[in-house]
Amino acid sequence: AGFETQITYQPVKAPAALPVRPPILCAGCMHRTAMYAMKKVFRDGIFPSDIGCYTLGIQLGTVDTTICMGASITVAAGMSLAGETRDIVCTIGDSTFLHTGIQGLINAVYNGANITVVILDNRITAMTGHQPNPTTGLTACGVATPAVSIEAVCRASGATFVETGSPNDLVTFIDVLKSARSLKGVKVIIARQPCVISEKRAKIVRGHYTVHQDLCIGCKACIKFGCP
């Protein structure tokens, strides 16, 4: 036996002018700022990417390929060695770099690729639940352990340029990207800023940002930036 219910509803048509709302990065995520800077410096570049939160950078125009963990660097190197002359800038997270990115970096250096590698180091393995990784100095059980230096690994791999910067210092970070762009070979930029979710859990309080309706001029910079 069963029963039926009568539902009364009125269909509603959405306004035609509503913008598309695709999945985006978290509010305050440093990946957004890093990718915004990348797009400003490498305007006509090619952007192979990897598996992580930063895959959502596709909405910012800085993710052209995503295949599997570690493929960003190897795809970038392959494009360079195949004769691509445009800027090739790949993105990979700190966890993924340690998982399967180091081999690709060594291969790119060994074979003479001309690429820029941006390692998005948010100090945690964020996408799968904020687990620690070898760069954090903690084991999965929270026990202190020696931390791996991404800078040291990259220099040992033979990268011609290794610099670290915070995307939150946008002007300085853009200058680092420009310096890398002016050089040949395998250049590595480590974009380091803690995951904003981890910061919130650590009770690091930030202010709330809103659009000031009286000052807004409709330039749509916030939309281009992917501001949530």
What residues fall within each predicted segment?
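Terminal amphipathic helices with adjacent charged low-complexity linkers/tails
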Residues: A1-T8, A191, G207
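Iron-sulfur cluster-binding cysteine motifs and their immediate structural context
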Residues: I217-P228
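Active-site diphosphate/adenylate-binding microenvironment
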Residues: I7-I73, A82-T85
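Generic long, charged, amphipathic alpha-helical segments
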Residues: G207-L215
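Cys/His-rich Zn2+-binding cysteine-cluster or related metal-binding knuckle/ribbon modules and their
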Residues: V196, K203-H208
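Thiamine diphosphate
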Residues: I58-V188, R201
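Short glycine-rich anion-binding loops that position phosphate/pyrophosphate groups of nucleotides
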Residues: C53, Q193-V196
